[in-house]
């Protein structure tokens, strides 16, 4: 019997030693070369490198130039031309004989302006202006979407750091459990089943710690990718938990001023302007042009005087497409369909935003309430674990009671961590929906 106890005791000691070695070999929470970032720094870095944000800024550049081109349509077009030629036979230029090999110069300057285009230029400008507004709203929307995604990865990494600490505390409690069971087994107050069960619980605690560390490394790598850094990134936590925001007027303001709503409304205005552009094909186009040219033996840079022949022309033209095989009708019908779709998308965007806001606000209030509940549960579970451990040590309780109490404490701590960061993530999601800080 004593030999059996010594064998069991030796196995338990071996398990404790291997656990201690594994704990000594686990990496430190922050390595010397690991980048540490605050949430504000992480968001700033992400806004610089995320492709969606780069694309949104590029769309603004394109929209700005589209608007500039639409404005330029109201200005005259100016063209300058100049040429020089010679031939191997004699000729006459402006009635004068020209010997072979002599250069003859032609120079011209033309200015043209559309006087009336059936309001096409005005509708194009309105379309470009609405497109620019949509691009601005897209940038704002992407800024908050990227910020929310970065915040989620940031808080997920912090949560996994806390879960590693929970797993470490679980491992320490498992060590205490196995030590108590060994002491009781040596004193004859516990059975071999108790020591073996405690050994299994210790192994499970070690596995939980390894899994928590692996999950933490994955979370830190995902955060590093989000902010454009190779390797792992350590987030710096904020010690203060923000209070619940005032959401009294949040929904009404979001349905009018949220970036996604503003973008959809701007695209609707752009589609409306495009319909007027297509209708301009039914109206005539009136243009005016003025041309001055010079031809002769005098170089262009010496002026238009001398023997050159100067010609000045002024022209007004009218063009009216009366029928083009129903192409105008097809274009007009297509733009009208796009306008109907844009109006439906604007209305659906508001409905979708309202539904998402309801979901995220529910998550926000629920997670905030869970913070208080889980904190109380941790206090109660810790006290219950202490009492149960003391009862087991004195022989008034069973190992099963102790394992149950310790499992309840571990789960309560996990729930507390998840509740805190679920609240922070839900808050970031609400900010992304409404387009401003809470």
Please state what every model-predicted region is:
Residues 142-255, 360-363, 367, 408-409, ...:
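Periplasmic alpha-helical coiled-coil/stalk elements that build and connect Gram-negative outer-membrane
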Residues 1-5:
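N-terminal secretory signal peptides that target proteins for export/translocation
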Residues 54-58, 71-72, 101, 115-143, ...:
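Sec/SRP-type N-terminal targeting helices
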């Amino acid at each position: 019997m004593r030999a059996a106890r010594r064998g069991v005791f030796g196995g338990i000691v071996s398990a404790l030693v291997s656990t201690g070695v594994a704990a000594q070999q686990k990496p430190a929470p922050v390595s010397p070369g690991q980048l540490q970032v605050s949430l504000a720094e992480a968001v700033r870095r992400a806004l610089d490198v995320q492709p969606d944000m780069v694309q949104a800024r590029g769309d603004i550049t394109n929209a700005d130039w589209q608007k500039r081109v639409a404005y330029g349509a109201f200005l005259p077009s100016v063209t300058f031309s100049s040429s020089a030629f010679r031939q191997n036979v004699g000729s006459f230029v402006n009635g004068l004989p020209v010997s072979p090999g002599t250069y003859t110069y032609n120079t011209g300057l033309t200015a043209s302006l559309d006087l009336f285009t059936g309001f096409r230029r005005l509708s194009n400008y309105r379309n470009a202006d609405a497109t620019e507004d949509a691009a601005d709203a897209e940038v704002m929307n992407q800024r908050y979407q990227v910020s929310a995604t970065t915040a989620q990865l940031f808080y997920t990494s912090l949560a996994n750091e806390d879960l590693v600490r929970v797993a470490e505390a679980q491992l320490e409690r498992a060590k205490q459990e196995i030590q108590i069971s060994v002491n009781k087994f040596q004193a004859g107050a516990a059975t071999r089943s108790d020591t073996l069960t405690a050994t299994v619980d210790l192994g499970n605690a070690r596995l939980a710690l390894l899994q928590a560390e692996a999950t933490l490394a994955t979370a830190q790598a995902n955060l590093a990718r989000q902010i454009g850094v190779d390797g792992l990134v350590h987030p710096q936590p904020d010690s203060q938990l923000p209070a619940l925001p005032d959401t009294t007027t949040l929904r009404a303001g979001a349905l009018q001023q949220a970036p996604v709503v503003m973008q959809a409304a701007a695209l609707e205005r752009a589609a409306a302007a495009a319909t007027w552009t297509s209708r301009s094909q039914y109206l005539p186009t009136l243009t005016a042009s003025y041309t001055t040219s010079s031809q002769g033996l005098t170089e262009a840079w010496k002026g238009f005087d001398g023997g050159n022949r100067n010609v000045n022309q002024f022209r007004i033209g009218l063009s009216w497409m009366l029928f083009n095989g129903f192409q105008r009708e097809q274009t007009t019908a297509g733009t009208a369909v796009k306008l109907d779709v844009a109006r439906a998308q604007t209305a659906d965007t508001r409905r979708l935003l309202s539904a998402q806001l309801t979901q995220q606000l529910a998550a926000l209030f629920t997670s905030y309430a869970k913070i208080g509940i889980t904190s109380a549960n941790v206090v109660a579970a810790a006290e219950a674990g202490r009492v149960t451990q003391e009862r087991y040590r004195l022989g008034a309780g069973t190992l099963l009671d102790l394992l149950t109490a310790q499992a309840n404490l571990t789960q309560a701590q996990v729930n507390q961590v998840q509740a805190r960061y679920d609240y922070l993530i839900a808050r970031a999601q609400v900010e992304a929906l409404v387009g401003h800080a809470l």
